[in-house]
Amino acid sequence: MSHYRAKTALPLCALPFIFFSLSVAAAEAQVKIDTQVGFHGLFRLGYPFPLRVELANLGGVAQGILEVRVWKGGPARGVDLYPVYHRRRVLLPAQSRKSFQFTIDPDSVSRPLTLTFSGAGSRWSKEIDLRRHFSAAPLLVLVTENNFLPPLPVGPTFAGPLISLALGDLPADPRAYQGVSALVFYEQSLRDLSRRQLAALEGWLSSGGRMLILGSLHYALYQEAAMSRFLPVRVAGLKRFSALPDLDRRYGKAGAPLKDLWGQAARLVEGRAVLEDGGLPILVETDRGKGKVFYLAVDVGRPPLSRWEGLPALFRDLLASLPERSPTPQARWDDTVFSQLLATPSFISAYVPVRSFFLWTLFYLGGAGAVVWGWREHRLSRRKLALCFVLLNALASLGGYLYFSRRGNVPDGVLLTATLLDGSTGGYAEAQSNVALFSTQTRAYGVLVENGWSDLEALYPRPGTAAESAVVAEEEGSATRFSFPLSEWGYRLLRIRSQSLFPLGLELEDRGDRLTLRLNNRSAKDLTECWFVVRGQSFFLGDIARGSSLVREFAREAKAPASESQRPRLDLREIRFDNRLHEVLFRHSFFPDGQGLGRWSGDGALFFGWVREASPRVWTDDGHVLAYDYTLFRVIIPLDGGGDLDEG
């Protein structure tokens, strides 16, 4: 009997829980939006920065779209204002919180950011005034365990603010670090960093970032695999240094010298030891692409080094900004350049079915010829001739319209990408991609950009409404999708910068009477139609397959010119390629004469070649859009002196 009563009472006890669940599910969602701008509320003006958005759902289940509107363009950019919408599809359980990371890059802080969450007929929005958060100086970010702040003397030596950041707050996008001058690690384990965070740090370093790793007594933290990815040394343990005369001599003052301090015993793996003691590196500097990594073996957070008078001078050197690099000449597509590309026969054949159009023309001319023949031979009456002529034009017009607009292999659009890879040290190459999407139909289009890009600018060829010029950005795994509408026979231009690996070894040795060029293609791609330009002369090198090497010598025939005006200049438009579209892109895109890049003087040597079957950085998954991708790799080598050369 007791078993029967318990079995009967069980559903009755479950009724309150069922009614509570139904009431929560039926309740309307109440969403609250909280944000954190930049690094603890600060970002550097004119650079991308991270934005953390937290959605707190105080009601039932909510499903919708989180959107951040950013304004781009303006007079400073030379283009009209247009909005960029960063979107995420969100599912919020009842009574829950979720955080989302964005990297945004507004061109002006005068317009507020607008955050919107909309779904199921409800809409919540919030505006952020960016004028309260920006810093004109670069930021210095310190990452330590438990946000412990060591005594870093950066006041007079560094103009920007010092921000202490937790490891979990590091962004997972390399673009978010562009406003950071240096990233300092002290007594911090990196094993909890995600793969995306580690990849973001490496991408930021290779594009010009600076990382400072300060040693401490907790040497085991510096032996972890995650930290070893950035360290130029291998830490073995601790060592007590009785004195560091080289460090005292370089940075010390008239005070007492350093004595009896602890540091890490390490072995140099890469880079160079700026300071060492007894064969052990004390201060190490190494290059990572365009960036640098510094390692200091001694502990600056504990005495006696923390009270040392030479510490400000040491940090002045370590935190000094990287020297400005002279920008390499890079072409940018505009309406003039793209109009020239659009009018070339090689590009016209990409969106016009020439063979079908030729057959259609033959059909029309054949029909017209038959009508004329019937009129000349008096085989048809005037009424029948007129009827045949009208029917011929009607059939040709209607059939041509239906065939070429809906069938006939006429694409809805053509995506053309021209990428210029600028080789640099460490096997890295800066990629600048000029992208054009040409439309034959009025519809919305989408392009995918590989993650890791550092800058993107979407140009609209003519002034339009906000809806026509808007761009929607959505992250999709390892790529970012950019969507925008286009009218019939309209187009849109994109400029994208990124950093990638392309290990091509190039050495140019000047022996006085001759130059020796050594090339070693260590990349996974073949180079075709390679050229070498030096002192106003061009030399064809042919193809360089992956894994192969090439050595050429060029004999000097004359002395250097006496003045700058006497230096020979080569018109790069005289160089010919087997591929006609290669030639068009080379003339109008990579080295357009209208932008002052068509002539090459004797200021340096130039090597370039086409990358065969390059991995696309921009692509589309739309089957109705044809995609063409072309990549040119080049290296510019500074060269002093002059004289004509002859290939030896």
What do these predicted ranges mean?
Residues 72-108, 537-564:
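Intrinsically disordered, low-complexity Pro/Gly/Ser/Thr-rich segments with frequent PxxP/GP/PP motifs
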Residues 154-157, 175, 185-278, 314:
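A glycine-rich, often tryptophan-bearing local segment used as a flexible ligand/cofactor-contacting loop or short
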Residues 179-180, 210-211, 264-370:
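A glycine-centered loop/beta-turn motif at secondary-structure junctions
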Residues 382-406:
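Internal/C-terminal transmembrane anchor helices
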Residues 386, 404-425:
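Alpha-helical transmembrane signal-anchor/signal-peptide segments
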